[in-house]
Amino acid sequence: MRFIRRNRGFTLIELLIVIIIIGILAAIAIPMFLNQRDKAKNATVKGGVHNVELGIASYAIDHSDTYPGTGTVSKATMVDGIGTPYVDDWPQNPYAGGDMVEGAGAGNYTYTLTSTNFTLVGHGRGGANIITAP
């Protein structure tokens, strides 16, 4: 009696092709995933800048339409200062952790006062400007 032997399985070429396809899919998916993380961090910075902007507007209402001076917008003056806090919960820096501070680094803001108005700029990765208020 003869036994018929059937080899079932994948060849080396087939396995290599599958590995190459998985590598190509990973090369496409990983940068897209990292880009989504940056978008989420930028959205956090935008929300934080908006909260600080509202705090500055509240400060101006309480001080005869006078905005705080350049370099004076911080957690110490807008939240922890004497009297009513102008920002209930100071925004966090999504890039470095901790509180958002004035400066050009990622996740921070820059506040500039002109004679009639102010400019508040939020910074993303590498210090790039991602939002300007108002």
Where are these regions (language model features)?
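Alpha-helical hydrophobic helix detector
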Residues: 16-32
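N-terminal leader/signal peptides at the extreme start of proteins
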Residues: 1-10
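Extracellular/periplasmic head regions of type IV pilus-like filament subunits
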Residues: 57, 61-119
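Low-complexity, S/T/G/P-rich flexible repeat/linker segments used as non-globular hinges
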Residues: 123-134
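Membrane-proximal N-terminal amphipathic helix
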Residues: 40-65
